[in-house]
């Protein structure tokens, strides 16, 4: 059977989180009543002239710098002409031959792999969004309604080179791209609200060939899982067509998430079909290098850089670093807690396990989490300093969730500080040995797990306050080292 290679390129539209639209002063707030955020410019009324939103331009430059793009110092806007009910002007203001950013790329790692992969970018350009069509759910009322709140919302379109060879690569590429966009705070990337949308361009070719096959563009991909599923389905469909000797036209398809298949929408338009020409209402933009460098100075530490620092400087395992740096707010929370605790690994464990566990369960952001990073840092410091055990820490944590008290106050009020009185601990250890002779016998026959039962007895009697290290030390002194198994 013939073997094929999959070729994938992605086009991502990210809505920029500006307060007003790209060429007008209308607001961009999601969820407002239909057609309540419009003005003559986004309605396309005669005589209404566009004026570029400076903040949208800056955010586009910042995105380009974050992905290592070259910034075009001489750039312009073009009219992309097509007719659709949600496009009142009859054209979309976009960028054609002079995009604001060119080149660059996205670095990502596939789960379970150590080496990073890199997908080149073709360009990033600015454009305005179209409106939204809302179709009647009643088949007896065949009507559609137009909401132009979204018309004129600023977008950047991030176009990749056809460098991806599997749906897995596409999935992790998108996750990395989204992480960077959120880190630099140019977009909230909320797919449910439509602020991040993706189209996939998919083709196949015989392995070893350097010619591209017929391309299919897939739209209506409202999640990264949908992107992965749509690519997998389309690749199999194209392989079947090739093996049967059938051909097909370049086309646009929709992803049907109910039927789990791609459905033909129309034959694909080429760039000349849109009759691009420079927008006569908008002057060309001539950027100064100083302007670009000013934007560069505002860039935060990016996810990959931060992840590498957590591993190399803080000594965290790679997995911990990946979890902590996936979102900027989580990484900030961790570092703020670490400033207080001084113990990177213990702080990491608490943030990624206990705190993110609650955050994910309650479907909130870490910014909405009730316990501040400082208070968590204080709790972890008590553990690191040996003042409380991990078990007691969880009791303290439960109270932190429902009160404004700091960890040390809770520990003091409830008398939870670890017992370090050698004589008192030795008394309990002797009692544990005397009352757990079966465990002692198993330990002396080489079963190391038996020691846990004796330690558990000590911790129960001491209500979790005995110093675990001291308990283990005393037990080894009294029982001797673990003998080889008989």
Swiss-Prot record:
Superkingdom of this protein's organism: Bacteria
Record keywords, A-Z: ATP-binding, Ligase, Nucleotide-binding, Protein biosynthesis
Pfam family, any one: GatB_Yqey
Top-level class of the enzyme under EC nomenclature: ligase
Listed GO MF terms: asparaginyl-tRNA synthase (glutamine-hydrolyzing) activity; ATP binding; glutaminyl-tRNA synthase (glutamine-hydrolyzing) activity
Biological processes annotated in GO: glutaminyl-tRNAGln biosynthesis via transamidation; translation
InterPro entries in the record: Asn/Gln-tRNA_amidoTrfase_suB/E, Asn/Gln-tRNA_Trfase_suB/E_cat, Asn/Gln_amidotransferase, Asn/Gln_tRNA_amidoTrase-B-like, GatB, GatB_C_1, GatB_Yqey_C_2, Gln-tRNA_amidoTrfase_suB_CS
Catalytic activity, as annotated: L-glutamyl-tRNA(Gln) + L-glutamine + ATP + H2O = L-glutaminyl-tRNA(Gln) + L-glutamate + ADP + phosphate + H(+); L-aspartyl-tRNA(Asn) + L-glutamine + ATP + H2O = L-asparaginyl-tRNA(Asn) + L-glutamate + ADP + phosphate + 2 H(+)
Enzyme Commission number(s) of this protein: 6.3.5.-
Assembly mode: Heterotrimer of A, B and C subunits.
Family: Belongs to the GatB/GatE family. GatB subfamily.
Function: Allows the formation of correctly charged Asn-tRNA(Asn) or Gln-tRNA(Gln) through the transamidation of misacylated Asp-tRNA(Asn) or Glu-tRNA(Gln) in organisms which lack either or both of asparaginyl-tRNA or glutaminyl-tRNA synthetases. The reaction takes place in the presence of glutamine and ATP through an activated phospho-Asp-tRNA(Asn) or phospho-Glu-tRNA(Gln).
Name of the protein in its database record: Aspartyl/glutamyl-tRNA(Asn/Gln) amidotransferase subunit B
Organism: Leptospira interrogans serogroup Icterohaemorrhagiae serovar copenhageni (strain Fiocruz L1-130)
Gene: gatB
